[in-house]
Structures are given as C-alpha cells and as structure tokens.
A protein has these predicted regions:
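Transmembrane alpha-helices
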Residues: 20, 123, 127, 179, ...
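C-terminal transmembrane helix and the adjacent membrane-cytosol boundary/short C-terminal tail
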Residues: 5-7, 190-205, 272-299
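Cytoplasmic-entry segments and transmembrane alpha-helices of multi-pass inner-membrane transporters
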Residues: 16-18, 105-139, 143, 201-202, ...
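Short membrane-interfacial helix/loop motifs at transmembrane-helix boundaries
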Residues: 30-79, 147, 250-251, 299
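Transmembrane alpha-helix signature in integral membrane proteins
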Residues: 78-112
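Membrane-interfacial helix termini and adjacent extracytoplasmic/periplasmic loops
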Residues: 55, 60, 137-178, 212, ...
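N-terminal signal-anchor/first transmembrane alpha helix
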Residues: 1-39, 109, 119, 123
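Interhelical loop and adjacent transmembrane-helix boundary motif
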Residues: 8-14, 57-59, 72-75, 79, ...
Length: 299
C-alpha cells in the first residue's frame, strides 16, 4: 500500500516537474499572444480599453460575434506598413550578414588561442552585457555626433575638413545593431567550432589538402549549425529593434518597431498595433521553422 502511494507520488511529482515549463510557456507566451490576436480583431474606440469587445449578448440571450479583419486589410493596403516591414527585414538581414562576416573569424581565432588568452577574449566579448544597453547606445550617439570622438580624430588627422554626418543615418543604425548583437553571433559559433574534431583537418593536411580547402570542405560545413543559430539570435531581435533605430537613426529610420510604438502610444490604435505585432510574429516564425526543418534533415 505504501509502495503504491510512493509510486503515485513519484509520478505526480515527475508530471509537475515536466509540466512546469509548459505551464510557464502557456501563461506567459501563448496567453499574451492570444490577447494580442484578440485585440487585433476589434475596432478602435475612444475609451478604456480603447477597443471594442469581440462579442456581446443580444436581447434574445444570444452571443453576437463582433470580430473584424479590417486591421489586417489596412496593413496590406497601406504602403507605410509595407515599407516598415521591408526596411526592417533589410536592416536585420544586412546586420546579420555583417555580424557573420565579422563574428566567424573572431570565433575561429578564439578557438585557436591558448587557455588564458581564450578566457580573456571571451570575457571581453561578454563584458558589454555588464553595462546597460541604453548606456551603450548613448555612448555611440556621443561617438558618432558632429563633435564626437570619430569626427574629432578625423579632423585632427587632416583626413576631412568638415565634420561628417554620422549620427541619424542608416550607417549609425547598422553600427549600433552590429555592435549590440555581435556577441550573439560569436558565442554559438565559438561553441560549435570548439567542439570540432581537429583530426579531420589534420588528416586532410596529411593527404595534401591546402588549409583554405580543408576549411571550405570540413570546418565550414561542420560549423553550419552554429552559423544558423547565430543568424537566428541576431536576425530575430534585430527585426523588431526599436531603441537603436530611434536613437541612432532618428525620425527618418522607419522600422516596424517604431511603427508599432507609434500605433500603441501615440495613435492609441491598439487593434491596428496588435495586427502589426501579429504579422511581425508570423514573419519571425519563418526563420525558426526553416531552422527546425534543417535540424530534422540533419538528424
């Protein structure tokens, strides 16, 4: 009898431990997304909350559904939102490519270093996370301004005669995003390259393969999972970035994060803003599905 109670308690405890993460995902991920989608099917009104209910009781004690897809139709018809989405995808894709081109050699070089130097370089990579994200962005504003460090050095060296307009440009946005998310590219690449079997490259060298050929045929294909993981970790947050385009790009930098903020807090059009957020979420799911498909093919 006691043994049966113990087995029952063990199963209950195991189910509780396993189910806790799923409960967390449901409460803090699926439920909020459900509320956002629900609001996107409503109409904006002046009131609190600033949207219409999705159903109401009629005089005949029946539920009347009041959903509408006008917000989604408006997104597809209005050019402003398409420009925001396309510009966000462009900025995120180019920033991800730059992070990959810069981060891969850095990650590869770190794996070739000795123990103490390797630890020191990894510390330098994660060191920016110890400071506030906003402080780092404000620091770049000071460096890129007309009288900032970069323009001052260029003027004193005689390379330019007039200060360059670096702040509030697309270049400043790319610099800020690459600087912020570069560690998210380097760390998964380093973890992948650190686990590679050096015997394979040594065997290729013994067979007469040149180093660059061994890299293209062995190291690069084996590091594909790290490349994909790093690209996802950079592309997904960069796509919805709001702070960097606003502070470094100014008002002319139109990205979907800024559009979403304006609809929520300035226009107070919560249904339209929820539709913008829902469509953005669908766009973010696409690279994740591609990565999952790749993992299934690999296994």
């Amino acid at each position: 009898m006691n043994e049966n109670k113990y087995i029952h308690f063990e199963r209950l405890w195991r189910g509780l431990v396993i189910g806790t993460p799923y409960l967390w995902l449901v409460l803090f991920f699926l439920v909020p997304i459900g509320f956002v989608f629900k609001i996107s099917l409503a109409d904006p009104i002046i009131g609190q909350p600033p949207f219409t209910p999705l159903w109401e009781w009629t005089d005949s004690a029946r539920i009347s559904i009041l959903t509408t897809f006008d917000n989604y139709r408006f997104l597809f018809m209005e050019e402003l939102y398409w420009i925001s989405y396309l510009n966000s995808v462009k900025v995120a894709a180019i920033s991800t490519l730059i992070c990959l081109l810069v981060g891969y050699p850095m990650a590869y070089g770190i794996t070739r270093c000795s123990g103490n130097i390797k630890s020191f370089l990894l510390l330098l990579i994660v060191l920016p996370f110890w400071t506030s994200f906003l402080l780092r962005v404000y620091a770049w504003m000071g460096m890129l301004s007309t009288h900032g460090v970069i323009n001052t050095l260029l003027l004193n060296s005689g390379l330019i005669e007039q200060p360059l307009k670096l702040l509030y440009t697309d270049l400043a946005v790319y610099v800020g995003i690459v600087y912020t998310y570069l560690p998210f590219m380097i760390l998964p690449l380093y973890a992948n390259l650190e686990r590679r079997d050096l015997v394979l490259t040594e065997a290729a060298a013994d067979l007469g393969s040149r180093p660059w050929r061994a890299f293209l045929d062995i190291t690069l294909p084996l590091s594909t999972p790290g490349i994909i993981a790093g690209c996802l970790l950079v592309f997904i947050p960069a796509l919805g970035e709001f702070v960097i385009p606003t502070l470094l790009g100014g008002l002319d930098s139109l990205m979907i994060g800024r559009t979403l903020f304006d609809e929520f807090f300035q226009n107070r059009d919560w249904p339209l803003a929820s539709a913008v957020a829902t469509l953005l979420l669908l766009i973010l799911i696409i690279p994740i599905m591609i990565f999952q498909k790749y993992r299934e093919q690999e296994t």
